[in-house]
Regions:
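Active-site neighborhoods of enzymes that stabilize oxyanions during catalysis
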Residues: 17-43, 47-55, 65, 247-465, ...
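Short helix/loop capping segments that flank catalytic or ligand/cofactor-binding pockets
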Residues: 58-61, 164-166, 214-216, 223-229, ...
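Short secondary-structure boundary/capping segments
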Residues: 64-68, 169-176, 217-230, 322, ...
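A structural signal for the main folded, soluble domain(s) of proteins
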Residues: 80, 87, 146, 163-166, ...
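Glycine- and acidic
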Residues: 121-129, 164-175, 212, 444-452
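A long, amphipathic alpha-helix that forms part
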Residues: 133-134, 154, 161-204, 228-238, ...
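Metal-dependent active-site segment of extracytoplasmic phospho-/sulfohydrolases and closely related
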Residues: 185-223, 358-361, 365-366
């Protein structure tokens, strides 16, 4: 199995990090996983997504941003928004207002001594305005335009709440206020549906693939990062490449800049001028977003690569072409696993042994293959899905040599992100593992897709349910039905094994 173990991960066969919202990497992932039967394969439209879902029309879709591909979509799809005062002028005014709102709300958190909190300044101010206003309005305009063309299905990603909650907190006033903007977006779409002006009737399905968990970051709590903790227990001269800065949020901005630079308009020419000295495929990102070396020869591959995805960390021994076992790691770096497992900010680590994956905690171990627990079960605070989830991700060919999950405080319902984000997702603990699926009341959920607790568990299962709903609506008639189709293959990237 070769599924992505995180939002960004080290691919042994490539000898580098792969990041899902980098255009070249998104295109690589999609080329390996696509079987031509994606969710949007039947005359669908992808808007503001990482991947196209095999849609014939892709707008602001990351996997199509790579030069030479048509995934950005036809220029006429954007013309009305960028040329009509009701579109661009309104968005610009509200975007400027959002900048002022963020500056005020960030200072208010400081004055009121709201904790936990992080610094909210610099590029994030513009990032919030772009994602919470400008892109939202553009997305709505593109959805309505696709509806007026009679497209069979439309899949759009709104990142408003997610982005603000990362920086302000999960239940903070400004984060929750983002839902008003989403309500307005949905209302605009529903008004078009109810008016009957579109050539076909549409139904709306809402999907949130994760929640968010809150807490002071790992660095705020202990004065050092995960990478620095590991580096303290390496031999002198060994190098660590760390990628623990937030890069997820910059994907939508890169999509917007990529599309603007391709427009034959005033805004397009201005964008080209601003980014003229940049590689057109190079993503815009905050300083330090890429993996940074902490020691050693800059020209040689790092000995270790440490990645943070929310409160889930991944550690790869980069110079080894195969995944190391716990026994290998102990021989190379005696005591490192014990140091990580015993750290108060770490709930557990998962490593592969000669007999399968094992979770190690400060006071016990859990064999994920046999279920045998010695001492205190380190997975107990993380819920009944923890074992199955880590059994699954441990099978990924490019899984890290060491998975690291932060602490979880069940009283405060808090975790400790390895990125500098007060709200996070990626690991276990708290609300981040609570997704959402809202569908028309008249649609039924297929019993054969439910797990033993009556849930649609996992992205693959939700995808299959969405496909079946489309089939019941009369779509995908030229494609193999889900019930008899082969299970999609996981992402297959070089492993070096």
């Amino acid at each position: 199995s070769g599924g992505p173990p995180a939002f960004r991960w080290f691919v042994r066969g490539l000898g580098r990090l792969v990041v899902a919202n980098r255009p070249a990497d998104a295109a690589l992932i999609e080329s390996r996983v696509s079987d031509g039967r994606g969710l949007l394969a039947d005359d669908g439209v992808s808007i503001s997504n990482l991947f196209s879902g095999d849609a014939p029309t892709s707008l602001l879709t990351m996997s199509g941003l790579k030069e030479g591909r048509a995934g950005l979509g036809p220029s006429q799809s954007y013309a009305a928004f960028f040329t009509h005062p009701a579109g661009i002028l309104r968005a610009v005014i509200l975007t400027v207002g959002e900048v002022g709102k963020e500056l005020f709300q960030a200072r208010r958190q400081v004055r009121r001594r709201v904790e936990p909190r992080i610094h909210r300044g610099g590029a994030y101010v513009a990032l919030r305005a772009a994602t919470n206003v400008f892109l939202r309005d553009l997305n709505v305009a593109l959805v309505v335009e696709a509806m007026m063309r009679g497209s069979t299905s439309i899949y759009v990603d709104f990142v408003d709440y997610d982005e603000i909650a990362h920086h302000a907190g999960v239940t903070r006033a400004e984060s929750l206020a983002a839902f008003y903007g989403l309500d307005d977006a949905l209302r605009s779409i529903e008004q078009v549906i109810e008016s009957g002006v579109a050539p076909r009737h549409y139904e709306v399905v809402l999907v949130s693939d994760h929640g968010q968990s809150q807490g002071a970051t790992f660095r705020q709590r202990y004065g050092h990062s995960l990478e620095e903790l590991i580096r303290q227990h390496l031999d002198d001269g060994q190098s660590v490449a760390a990628a623990t800065n937030d890069v997820e949020a910059w994907g939508p901005v890169n999509l917007l800049l990529g599309q603007l630079s391709r427009q034959d308009s005033v805004s397009g020419r201005l964008t080209k001028r601003v980014i003229s000295d940049r590689d057109p495929e190079a993503p815009v990102a905050p300083r330090g977003a890429d993996a940074k070396r902490s020691a050693g020869d800059d020209d040689a591959p790092a000995d270790l690569t440490v990645v943070g995805s929310g409160n889930l960390g991944g550690v790869w021994f980069s110079q080894h072409g195969t995944r190391l076992t716990a026994e290998d790691i102990e021989a190379l770096h005696p005591g490192l696993l014990g140091v990580l497992a015993a750290h108060p900010g770490i709930g557990f680590v998962v490593v592969m042994t000669g007999s399968g994956p094992v979770a190690l905690g400060a006071a016990g171990t859990h064999d994920l293959t046999t279920g045998v627990v010695v001492g205190q079960d380190p997975l107990a605070p993380f819920g009944p899905d923890a074992v199955g989830d880590f059994v699954h991700v441990s099978t990924f060919a490019n899984a890290p040599d060491i998975y690291v999950n932060s602490l979880y405080d069940p009283v405060l319902d808090e975790v400790a992100a390895f990125e500098e984000l007060v709200g996070c997702h990626g690991g276990l603990g708290g609300w981040q593992t609570r997704p959402l699926l809202v569908h028309p009341a008249g649609w039924s959920v297929d019993a054969d897709l439910l797990d033993e607790r009556g849930r649609l568990h996992g992205a693959d299962t939700v995808h299959r349910q969405l496909v079946r709903w489309l089939e019941r609506l009369g779509h995908r008639q030229d494609l193999t039905p889900d019930a008899v189709a082969p299970v999609p293959l996981p992402v297959s990237l070089p492993t070096g094994e």
